[in-house]
């Protein structure tokens, strides 16, 4: 929205956007190449998987149910009265719903907001360079950066027998 827009105009436009996205969230949305196979490999190793998103809760759950049925154990999107990332609230909720401790969690993301979220939650983090932001934006967080799903899987599973 342009600077100086009246708050009521901004609110109406945002509400219209949210309705449109909820109705059209599948349009032009696909998993990145290699993601389904990597997730299957993690599930085969017994990993519990969760999604934490700043997208609205309903579309996030619809996307995950459509593209990854039965893969994720917890899916949390943006909801009223829950602070959005980089606040750690949704991460804590997800980790708790999985019956895990934050020290067992690995947060994977593709943006500076994700790096901040992991730091705020106090959990390990791996960032990926193929998503929302490029490598340069991710470097300041000091966590591993994966350039492919194969590299991400290797980072996640190193040390496993």
Where are the regions that the model predicts?
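Asp-based, Mg2+/Mn2+-dependent phosphohydrolase catalytic module
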Residues: 19, 40-43, 56-57, 61-161
């Amino acid at each position: 929205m342009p600077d100086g827009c009246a708050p009521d105009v901004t609110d109406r436009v945002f509400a219209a956007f949210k309705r449109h996205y909820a109705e059209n969230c599948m349009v032009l949305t696909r998993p990145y190449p290699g993601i389904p196979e990597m997730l299957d490999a993690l599930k085969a190793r017994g990993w519990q998987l969760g999604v934490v998103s700043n997208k609205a809760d309903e579309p996030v759950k619809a996307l995950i149910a459509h593209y990854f049925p039965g893969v994720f154990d917890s899916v949390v999107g943006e909801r009223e009265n829950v602070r959005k990332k980089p606040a750690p609230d949704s991460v804590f909720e997800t980790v708790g719903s999985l019956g895990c401790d934050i020290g067992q969690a690995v947060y994977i993301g593709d943006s500076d907001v994700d790096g901040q979220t992991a730091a705020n939650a106090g959990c390990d983090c791996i960032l990926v360079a193929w998503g929302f932001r490029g490598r340069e934006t991710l470097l300041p967080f000091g966590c591993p950066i994966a350039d492919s799903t194969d590299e991400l899987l290797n980072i996640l599973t190193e040390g496993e027998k």
